[in-house]
């Protein structure tokens, strides 16, 4: 299970007792990482909120929907910025790779903001993305934003992340990070191996 067939880096082999010592040492680092991640999650939740003043309208399956409509009776909303050129017959394969992980979450989670750009922004050569700017001509990028609606119906953006910041939402990458070969991607073209889930070729095909 890995994106490409390169062999993993050679590793030493040791008896079980020595392996267990090394594993327990790493476990202490993993626990520290978990504590740091929990602290970071608390800080993320404590970020100040930004009021959403603009009236956003989306093309829903049954017609136009406002940002408020997307809450569907809930107080919290997570929006994935999915790249889908209207001229294409399918959405971005990389965004689809992330979206494949969402369906299983939705039953549990149920009990365009700074990632798409107007023609004027693209023409200016400085569309804002990930608290920075993108190369000229780029019209949309992947990302994820979180919103909250208060009792008065006011909507606030509470968090956004982009690029490597969305890694935590991709279960496949979390598994690949556990195996000896890791993600094993071309550093100059990460995700070049990714296809829509029904468009992979069988090995040897």
Predicted regions: what is each one?
Residues 112-114:
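Loop/turn elements at helix/coil->beta-strand transitions in domains of secreted/extracellular proteins
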Residues 1-97, 103-108, 117-205:
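Non-globular targeting/processing and membrane-anchoring segments
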């Amino acid at each position: 299970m890995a994106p490409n067939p390169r062999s993993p880096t050679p590793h030493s082999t040791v008896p079980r007792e020595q392996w267990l010592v090394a594993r327990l040492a790493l476990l202490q680092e993993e626990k520290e990482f978990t504590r740091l991640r929990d602290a970071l999650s608390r800080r993320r939740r404590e970020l100040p909120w930004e009021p959403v003043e603009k009236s956003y309208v989306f093309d829903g399956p049954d017609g136009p929907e406002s940002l408020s409509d997307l809450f569907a009776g809930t107080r919290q909303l997570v929006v994935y910025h999915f790249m889908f050129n209207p001229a294409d017959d399918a959405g971005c394969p990389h965004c689809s790779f992330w979206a494949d992980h969402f369906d299983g979450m939705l039953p549990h989670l149920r009990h365009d903001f700074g990632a798409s750009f107007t023609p004027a922004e693209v023409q200016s050569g400085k569309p804002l993305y990930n608290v920075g700017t993108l190369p000229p001509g780029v019209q949309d990028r992947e990302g994820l934003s979180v919103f909250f609606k208060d009792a008065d119906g006011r909507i606030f953006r509470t968090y956004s992340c982009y690029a490597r910041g969305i890694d935590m939402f991709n279960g496949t990458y979390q598994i690949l990070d556990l195996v000896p070969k890791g993600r094993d991607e071309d550093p100059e073209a990460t995700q070049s191996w990714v296809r829509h889930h029904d468009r992979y070729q069988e090995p040897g095909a």
